[in-house]
């Protein structure tokens, strides 16, 4: 057995014949001579063979780092996946099989020992000669690789049973190879080429696992493919996590209605000061132990001064301003009566410092800001309305305490903010009557009077969100579809509420009615599908708060419910209603049916509509101005048709109008013409009265830049409830609002 110039010995050449060596080669790996005459003795053959295997194993481990060594048999075996992806040798039908008595090396069908990589330089010495070896391109490539200078060998550590320690193994990174080494490495074949070759099948050996390795060199998610497989997978995973986090942050900054008020908006400073004052004022009050209210609490005023430096009483702020919190203890108890958790309240308003604003103020000059989750409204009010609310605060608190199912607006806070060299801005925080997860297909604002209480139907509406009034209600033969049981409950509560308002000298309030058609659900996509919405079934996401009340699910909104509600039959519609509502809604009778009050027939069976009802505009006193208006309009018109009448007369007329509007018969919705936008033609069958409340001239306006869609009324009738006739679709997308009192 002779050793060639490269120091490689073919184990198949070892036979019983003892080959001769010169004196320089007649030494073992430790430098000891095998025989004085330079020849091997037969008794030394086995030990020399073991030394050769260790040497060859060391070569392979340094040349191909991805090799596993099994200590049980002391035979190195390559990683399965790497072994398969480096099958660059064609099958050799003339390969010689090893002797059955040899247990140290196993020869595969290609003639290469099982433990050696196919692209290793040692393969050339172990591969038996074949007739077509000179013409094989793989062998030519291998010869070129063998002719290149090989890296120097590291000394073998014989003290350890493991031939190569982990510290001696080069790093498993393709990027550490030099450019010349990369160029000299044989190219890997594609998966199809491997399967088409006559190489050993991947499943022929026990324990093999197929691994698909991309060799195209293209970037995946911006990550280079020439890094380790584990690092590459981890980098891809981290990049996708970052992308998902960025999408969630963008979704959190979305608003459901109006224009987003953020940095750069002309009213951002005002909105920032409002939210900062609310956060500090409510947090200070909630941090104290609860106690009973005293008469002084109804007139209390807490002042805060904010600047960029801050002090021991107030934190630093981005702007200098003054903030005043009115009756904080009273509104704390009111929030508890409305089942609103303080932490949930603050998170909804101030977690992202994002509000949405109506595009233009109402006739009264008030501005409306909505929390980003559409649950709360911040409304600026006149100084006279601010004073009047403080005057009636005690009566309002007692009424809410004694009538937990009241229909009047829910006030959560009364505040004032003053900018340097600016005017004082009074504002109130209250509830939004309409839920964010339901489309409101038609909206009405009812007062019981008819003079000037009409939205002209002969002229198309500028926006698809139009709030109609009393005359439109009467002309369309609209009514509240309540059976005998719900009729009695509803009228009893309306009577109690208007009696309280009349006793306080309040008039000019109105009944806000939003109608949701269950047969249509949210299929019209009135809201933009990219905006966040609530999932009414939030019980599994809710966590208890410190004071024992259940808190809403992080105030984060879920989008899966908006488009999930499709047309269903009348007997199935009631079964699809979520059993759980918002914490502050589910405890009230008139908000118990998916945030509203579901229609019923004469047998008190559930109907096909949900009514969202509330009494708004509570801060209009029968003042001197209203008396003059009553005298002026009373010259040419009867008191029964004008709005400015004394509170007692107004309450009586209002109750009679509501009472006459309740019927158990089926309700039929009619369309309203829409003004064409952007050159689009709108036919008479298009619907415009869809979506949430479109604020009228009393409550402000909203103009979202979304074009309405149209659909044939005939296609809509195919999806209608079997007991309800729908004559038109509701394709509008803009969102409108409920602007409750003041």
From Swiss-Prot:
Post-translational modification: Phosphorylated by casein kinase I. Phosphorylation inactivates the enzyme.
InterPro entries xrefs: PInositol-4-P-4/5-kinase_C_sf, PInositol-4-P-4/5-kinase_core, PInositol-4-P-5-kinase_N, PInositol-4/5-P-5/4-kinase
Keywords carried by this UniProt record: ATP-binding, Cell cycle, Cell division, Cell membrane, Kinase, Membrane, Nucleotide-binding, Phosphoprotein, Transferase
Gene Ontology BP annotations: 1-phosphatidyl-1D-myo-inositol 4,5-bisphosphate biosynthetic process; cell division; dynein-driven meiotic oscillatory nuclear movement; phosphatidylinositol phosphate biosynthetic process; regulation of mitotic cytokinesis
Record region (Disordered): 1-21, 82-228, 677-742
GO cellular component terms listed in the entry, alphabetical order: cell division site; plasma membrane
Ranges of Low complexity composition bias in the record: 90-105, 129-142
Keyword Membrane carried by entry: yes
Top-level EC class: transferase
Pfam families: PIP5K (PF01504)
Matches recorded under CDD domains: PIPKc_PIP5K_yeast_like (cd17303)
S-S bonds: none
Protein location: Cell membrane
Residue ranges, compositional bias (Polar residues): 158-181, 193-218, 680-719
Annotated ranges, domain PIPK: 264-662
Functional description taken from the UniProt entry: Catalyzes the phosphorylation of phosphatidylinositol 4-phosphate on the fifth hydroxyl of the myo-inositol ring, to form phosphatidylinositol 4,5-bisphosphate. Involved, together with the calcineurin ppb1, in cytokinesis.
Quaternary structure and partners: Interacts with opy1 (via domain PH 1); the interaction is direct but opy1 does not appear to regulate its3 localization or function.
Protein name per UniProt: Phosphatidylinositol 4-phosphate 5-kinase its3
Organism annotation: Schizosaccharomyces pombe (strain 972 / ATCC 24843) (Fission yeast)
């Amino acid at each position: 057995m002779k050793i060639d110039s490269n120091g490689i010995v073919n184990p198949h050449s070892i036979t019983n014949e003892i080959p001769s060596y010169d004196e320089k080669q007649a030494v073992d790996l430790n430098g000891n001579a095998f025989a004085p005459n330079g020849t091997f003795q037969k008794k030394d053959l086995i030990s020399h063979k073991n030394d050769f295997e260790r040497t060859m194993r060391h070569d392979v481990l340094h040349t191909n780092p991805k090799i596993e060594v099994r200590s049980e048999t002391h035979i190195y075996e390559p990683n399965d996946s790497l072994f398969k992806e480096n099958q660059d040798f064609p099958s050799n039908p003339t390969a010689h099989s090893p002797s059955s008595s040899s247990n140290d090396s196993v020869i595969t069908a290609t003639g290469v020992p099982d433990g050696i990589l196919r692209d290793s330089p040692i393969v050339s010495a172990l591969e038996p000669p074949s007739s077509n070896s000179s013409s094989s391109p793989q062998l030519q490539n291998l010869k070129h690789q063998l002719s290149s200078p090989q890296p120097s060998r590291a000394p073998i550590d014989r003290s350890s049973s493991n031939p190569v320690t982990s510290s001696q193994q080069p790093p498993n990174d393709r990027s550490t190879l030099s450019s010349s080494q990369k160029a000299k490495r044989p190219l890997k074949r594609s998966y199809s080429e491997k399967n088409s070759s006559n190489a050993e099948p991947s499943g022929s050996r026990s324990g093999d696992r197929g691994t698909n390795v991309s060799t195209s060199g293209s970037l995946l998610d911006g990550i280079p493919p020439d890094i380790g497989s584990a690092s590459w997978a981890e980098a891809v995973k981290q990049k996708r996590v970052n992308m998902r986090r960025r999408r969630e942050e963008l979704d959190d900054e979305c608003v459901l209605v109006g224009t987003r008020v953020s940095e750069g908006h002309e009213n951002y400073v005002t909105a920032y000061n409002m939210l900062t004052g609310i956060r500090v004022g409510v947090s200070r009050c909630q941090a104290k132990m609860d106690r009973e209210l005293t008469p002084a609490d109804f007139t209390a005023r807490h002042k805060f001064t904010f600047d960029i430096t801050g002090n021991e009483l107030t934190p630093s702020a981005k702007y200098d301003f003054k903030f005043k919190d009115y009756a904080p203890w009273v509104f704390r108890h009111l929030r508890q009566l409305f089942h609103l958790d303080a932490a949930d309240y603050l998170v909804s308003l101030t977690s992202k410092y994002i509000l949405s604003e109506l595009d233009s103020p109402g006739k009264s000059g008030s501005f409306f800001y909505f929390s980003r989750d559409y649950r709360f409204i911040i409304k600026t009010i006149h100084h006279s309305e601010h004073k009047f609310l403080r005057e009636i605060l005690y009566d309002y608190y007692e009424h809410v305490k004694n009538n937990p199912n009241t229909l009047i607006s829910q006030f959560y806070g009364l505040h004032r903010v003053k900018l340097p060299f600016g005017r004082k801005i009074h504002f109130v925080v209250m509830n939004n009557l309409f839920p964010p997860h339901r489309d409101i297909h038609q909206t009405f604002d009812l007062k019981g009077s008819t003079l000037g209480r009409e939205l002209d139907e002969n002229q198309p509406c500028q926006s698809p969100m139009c709030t109609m009034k009393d005359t439109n209600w009467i002309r369309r033969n609209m009514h509240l579809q309540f059976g005998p049981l719900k009729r009695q409950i509803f009228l009893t509560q309306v009577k109690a509420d208007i009696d309280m308002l009349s006793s306080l000298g309040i008039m000019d309030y109105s009944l806000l009615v939003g109608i949701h058609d269950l047969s249509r659900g949210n299929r019209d996509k009135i809201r933009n599908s990219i905006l966040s919405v609530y999932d009414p079934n939030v019980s599994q996401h809710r966590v208890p708060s410190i004071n024992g009340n259940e808190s809403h699910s992080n105030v984060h909104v879920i989008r899966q419910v908006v488009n999930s509600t499709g047309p269903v039959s009348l007997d199935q519609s009631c079964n699809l209603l979520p059993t759980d509502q918002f914490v502050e809604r589910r405890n009230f009778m008139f908000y118990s049916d998916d945030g509203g009050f579901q229609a019923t027939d004469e047998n008190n069976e559930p109907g096909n509509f949900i009514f969202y009802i509330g009494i708004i505009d509570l801060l209009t006193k029968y003042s001197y101005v209203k008396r003059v208006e009553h005298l002026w309009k009373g010259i040419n018109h009867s008191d029964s048709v004008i709005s400015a009448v004394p509170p007692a007369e107004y309450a009586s007329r209002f109750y009679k109008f509501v009472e006459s509007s309740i019927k158990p018969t089926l309700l039929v919705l009619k369309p309203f013409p829409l003004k064409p936008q952007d050159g689009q033609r709108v036919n008479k069958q298009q619907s415009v009265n869809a979506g949430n409340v479109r604020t009228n001239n009393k409550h402000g306006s909203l103009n979202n830049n979304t074009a309405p869609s149209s659909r044939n009324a005939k296609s809509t009738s195919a999806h209608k409830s079997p007991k309800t006739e729908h004559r038109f679709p509701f394709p509008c997308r803009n969102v409108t609002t409920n602007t409750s009192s003041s």
